[in-house]
């Protein structure tokens, strides 16, 4: 799987993804809020894969939240002289225990069997989203507490580079 790196404005991508999820959010009586740091002009990454990761995170936030709120916030940060973008998707949903979070990014895995029965899904979305972010030199992390919701954070370099030869193999192990 090869990255299709391009330079694109981040704010319209986030707006488009939120518009896609808003009808589902309305069905669950969820409010969706967006905050995008004006300092972020463009991002050099795989736009299609970032879109898919954001759709997965927002879909999950909506799936596990009823009559609550979902917020997506993007900001630019600098670490060790490199610019990064951080995109956080936070919800006021059911939340997870540390044990559940430990299984979250494994393929075909959900928090637990009762989650699969109640909410459906294959358990592939987060594993794939994490892989996409890692291919672009970033990652996805999660913070959560049962009954209080979850926050998933994507962190990507502002200028993603194509993975070095062999990096794809290491993701398959």
Which residue stretches match the model-derived regions?
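A conserved beta-strand-to-alpha-helix junction within the catalytic ATP-binding
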Residues: 4-19, 51, 86
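Short beta-strand/loop element within the Bergerat-fold HATPase_c
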Residues: 69-81
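ATPase catalytic-site recognition across NTP-hydrolyzing enzymes
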Residues: 99-106
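Conserved catalytic submotifs in the C-terminal HATPase_c
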Residues: 4-9, 26, 31-41, 77
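Glycine-rich G1-box
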Residues: 23, 94-95
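Glycine-rich ATP-binding loops of the HATPase_c
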Residues: 137-143
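Short helix-loop "hinge" at the ATP-lid/N-box region of the Bergerat-fold HATPase_c
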Residues: 61-62
């Amino acid at each position: 799987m090869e990255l299709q790196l391009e330079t694109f404005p981040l704010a319209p991508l986030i707006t488009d993804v939120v518009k896609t999820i808003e009808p589902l959010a309305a069905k669950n009586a969820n409010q969706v809020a967006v905050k995008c740091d004006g300092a972020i002009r463009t991002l050099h990454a795989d736009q299609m894969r970032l879109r898919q990761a954001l759709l997965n995170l927002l879909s999950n936030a909506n799936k596990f939240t009823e009559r609550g709120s979902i917020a997506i916030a993007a900001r630019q940060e600098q670490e060790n002289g490199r610019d990064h973008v951080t995109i956080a998707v936070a919800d006021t949903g059911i939340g997870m225990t540390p044990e559940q979070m430990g299984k979250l990014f494994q393929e075909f895995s959900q928090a637990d069997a009762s989650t699969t029965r109640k909410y459906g899904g294959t358990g592939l979305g987060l594993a794939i989203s994490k892989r996409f972010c890692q291919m672009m030199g970033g990652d996805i992390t999660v913070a959560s507490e049962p009954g209080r919701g979850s926050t998933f954070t994507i962190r990507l370099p502002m200028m993603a580079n194509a993975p070095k030869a062999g990096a794809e193999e290491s993701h398959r192990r």
